[in-house]
Amino acid sequence: MAAAAFAKRWEGRGYEKGESQTFWIELLTEIFGVESPSVFITFEQQAQLDHTSFIDGMIPSTHVMIEQKSLGKDLRQAIKQSDGSLLTPFQQAQRYSAVLPYSERPRWIVTCNFAEFDVYDMENPKGEPSRILLKDLEKEYYRLQFLVEQQGIHLQREMEVSMKAGEIVGKLYDAFVTQYDADDPQSLRYLNILCVRLVFCLYAEDAGIFGKRDMFHDFLAHYQTEDMRMALVQLFEVLNTPADKRSKYLNPSLAAFPYTNGGLFAEDIDIPQFTDELRDTLLQHASLDFDWSEISPTIFGGVFESTLNPETRRSGGMHYTSIENIHKVIDPLFYNDLRTAFEDCLEESNIKKRMQQLHALQDKMAELRFFDSACGSGNFLTETYLSLRRLENEIIKQIYSVEQLNAFENPIKVNIHQFYGIEINDFAVTVATTALWISEAQMMAETEKIIHHDIDFLPLKSYANIHEGNSLQIAWEEVCPKEELDYIIGNPPFVGYSLQSKEQKADLLNIFVDEKGKPYKTAGKIDYVAAWYYKAAQMMQNTNIHAALVSTNSITQGEQVAAIWKPLKEMFSIHIDFAYRTFRWDSEASLKAHVHCVIIGFSDAPTNKPKILFDNGQAIEAKNINGYLIDAPDVFVESRNKALCDIPLMTKGSQPTDDGNLIIEADEYEDFITKEPNANKFIRPFVGAQEFLNKKKRWCLWLVGASPSELKALPEVRKRVEAVREFRLKSKKEATRKKADMPTLFDERRASTTEYIIVPRHSSENRKYIPMGFVNPNIIASDAVLTIPSATLYHFGILESNVHMAWMRAVCGRLEMRYRYSKDIVYNNFPWPSPTTEQQAKIEASAQAILDARALYPDSSLADLYDPTLMPKELLQAHRQNDRAVMSAYGFSTKMTESECVAELFKKYAEMVE
């Protein structure tokens, strides 16, 4: 085993300066499978104290700081520092942490002497470290999993338990659904409510809420199958009845259950008769065989809703926001500040002042109000509540280590009444409310461990304000008054405009309106999620409300940027406070496609906090974050029919609209020519993105100028032409049906009479440069490419430069993550340089060098030549030479980063459009 081999190899060796980097690189690669350790971990990072010091190791993605010592050094003993102070290795690391930006501070500090690892969890900075010995690494390596997994083993366990819980709920659902009328919506509604109630009871018996473990099981176990239905009916009635209103003759086994309140058991629902299988599933599999007290309400809420949602079950599984992604929203929005405030309290040496500060912080937390306007199963609200309560428990622990608590006093102030939500699905509303109650019970149990006495959970005393309805048709202030609200959070639905229903399109047009109440012209071409941004911006006016939402990355790309962010800026003066640039969000459902998301935090309130861009695990401070999520001025690149600069016209290739009948594929070419040799004069190479990039062969029938007598003599061609006519006649589009009158011709014809440049409309995001190239006019370009007739080497050199690629990456749309090059956004808006004659000549020479380098590999496709791992040295050097020539023409330094380059291009663009 890798861990055993590593431990044996490092036994009895290790000195701080010479071997620590090798030690950690081998640990990460051999045991945890890190593929690029030089990227994953950084060594000797500077820390600016009153002198320059160096941090031994940092793992940014998992927020780990390493303080390494030589073999034999005592990790708990203070060591004299260069400034004369005496610090333990942990204190030394703490000092480094204190001077880092908050976003870069470690969650974990590891002190190590090659034989021992002391692990400090900074969620509990005063706690004792856990120690892992090198000699025990074979069995205990998993305790270092946090080095590579941000949420660590605990989250993995929560996930496993919650997913298992979802499976059990699915079994219960499947067992019950056969007893209900599956075609009756009301019956299915009763089934969903029944499942929620059963889960609450299963959790309550395992968590001790009912007073005695297995109480729910033991009560039902007394009943035979035929009596189970009535037993549940009676139990639900009792749970909904206060103790003083119950019959004094009530069966003692029922009377022992506490009053629940909260409305969970208020409605009379139809419960079907049980079968033996149903009884066994509930009592054995769901109750005795599983401990519900360990579930994560945040994860389970989503799993629960997905499990019981027939549409989701049919489409292939579960889909919910992970805890990690929720924290990407709430941590920079408010939670990091609260933790910093807590840590500041702990730094106060005066005990009286420290207690005052801790009480004030707890009071502040209890006054905060949170709103998720598309809350689904409540996972954002639930995780936010759990995070606040965990922090409050830390505060309570500190306070009551000094102050005495009255035996009847409840020290908890944060409560689920602070949380507001809107959700369109009635069942999801019930799940969200229940998930918050379970969260409350779990956190109350944690508080009880701190104060060493019990707090009554039942009857339920607090309620989350979850409202059922269409969030875009409800006045948000009616749900949560804006003067009371602090934060808007969530993951609203995103639906591309081409996939929106009539109702969704109507919602957008009703919301995305100008000062006169008229829909913006572009409102019909934006993602559905944009409506939530508009309503949030509207609500935060003249308040201190801050918002952060998970969204599709399309709202930060292409023409949607101007369509969405320009109105938000002009109407509401909002600014982006922080943002996560595009990251991939994988659904738990294996059948679902990957979703590419951004997270955007915004407000209209003035703030002194630095703006932060998160990208690939790095937190970068920005002067301004614009709608493209770039540190650059607020510039909106709008769709433009005519180029901003004096450059050749770009057009889309020719579109056949023929159902493939005017196209001759490579595998049918020989057969077609054999049957119709006289058609050869009308056959032209047909090149789209796939053909251009991958050296694939394809042809088309280009019948422009073909006379009736010529066509009459070509029976195979006539068959194809007739098929085109029939296909177009069946079209729903009137314009296409009209083109049935000219079935010999392409629907859209844009053949060039001169040599032209081809630009693929879609290209892999892994390429540094989009491959473009010159082709002769005999080639017919398909509508999968863009063409630039009459373009020169100079134009080619500019377009293939890193400057143009930086612009393209910033403003283009995306298909998943692939670049979507567009004429009206990317090309027509690009600010070209004004080179001298000498500079232009250099660009032409470097452009030719690119073509020459490609020509050295005639058997290689452009896809292979521009594969980052395969790109030939000559081609790479030619591109770099071209980059330098183009940057010189712009007056840019070759040391300029891509972000700096884009910022300068935005400035240049803004000047040109003024």
Residue ranges of predicted features:
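Preference for the N-terminal adenyl/adenosyl cofactor-binding alpha/beta module
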Residues: 1-9, 86, 112-115, 134, ...
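A short, conserved, highly charged catalytic patch centered on acidic carboxylates
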Residues: 1-108, 122-126, 152, 744
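Metal-dependent nuclease catalytic cores in nucleic-acid-processing enzymes
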Residues: 24-29, 88-109, 435, 439, ...
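Flexible phosphate/Mg2+-sensing switch loops adjacent to catalytic phosphate-binding sites
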Residues: 39-41, 214-219, 341-364, 388-417, ...
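Signature of N6-adenine DNA methyltransferases within the class I
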Residues: 45-53, 101, 108, 116-164, ...
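Polybasic, glycine- and aromatic-enriched phosphate-binding surface used to engage nucleic acids
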Residues: 94, 530, 607-608, 616-845, ...
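Flexible, glycine/threonine-enriched loop-and-boundary segments that flank and lead into catalytic domains
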Residues: 286, 351-369, 412, 454, ...
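Non-catalytic DNA-recognition/assembly elements of restriction-modification systems
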Residues: 375, 574, 716-724, 739-740, ...
